A protein has these predicted regions:
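Thiol-/selenol-based redox modules, centered on thioredoxin-like
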Residues: 134-172
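Structural microenvironment flanking redox-active thiols in thiol-disulfide oxidoreductases
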Residues: 68-106, 118-120
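A short beta-strand-turn-helix
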Residues: 33-53
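Short loop/turn microsegments at loop-to-beta-strand junctions
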Residues: 30-31, 53-54, 135-137
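Short active-site neighborhood of thiol/selenol oxidoreductases, capturing the structured segment around
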Residues: 48-68
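N-proximal helix/coil linker or "cap" segments that precede and/or mark the start of modular domains
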Residues: 3-32
Length: 172
């Protein structure tokens, strides 16, 4: 019985490492991406990286508790983020139409990209194992196109706090 408990504990510790193993790390060049936004427009990483600091965040699903809290939190911080030349882009497997409804309902003021095939999610290593859903992970991409900070937490508040601290470091 003790051996099975130990094996279960070890296995549970290895799963997160395996899930995030292919995720870009601080200092890596951010993977190029392109996706359709809520208005049906094609958005490419080359359109924003180099012009803005990019806060690229992945989240599980529109209209769910934590995802709504996170989106509204970025919305409410947009004034400060814009002053710091930060462009927020959210990514999930949801459709562009669903993103449009989500934006309308919560008055969101930033871009959401539809990633129905998971190409962006997979490029950033954020897919939930075996699912068409992303883990809650945020990447801060500097003007040079390199990853400056990565936050992996189910708690949206941690994303706000860590991203703001990383943005403040860039400004110094």
């Amino acid at each position: 019985m003790k051996l099975s408990s130990v094996l279960l504990a070890v296995f549970s510790l290895l799963i997160p490492a395996a899930v995030f193993a292919d995720m870009p790390k601080v200092g890596d060049v951010a993977p190029a991406f392109q996706g359709t936004d809520q208005d049906g427009n094609l958005v490419k990483s080359s359109d924003v990286i180099g012009k803005n600091i990019v806060l690229l965040y992945f989240y599980p699903k529109d209209f769910t508790g934590g995802c709504t809290k996170e989106a509204c939190g970025f919305r409410d911080r947009m004034g400060d983020l814009q002053k710091d030349n930060v462009k927020v882009i959210g990514v999930s497997f949801d459709s562009a139409d669903k993103h449009k409804s989500f934006i309308a309902k919560y008055n969101l003021n930033f871009t959401l990209l539809a990633d129905p095939d998971g190409k962006i999610t997979d490029a950033y290593g954020t897919r939930m194992m075996g699912m068409k859903m992303a883990n809650r992970v945020s990447f801060l991409i500097g003007l040079d196109g390199k990853i400056v900070h990565v936050t992996k937490s189910g708690n949206p508040q941690v994303h706000f706090t860590e991203m703001q601290a990383a943005i403040d470091q860039i400004k110094k």
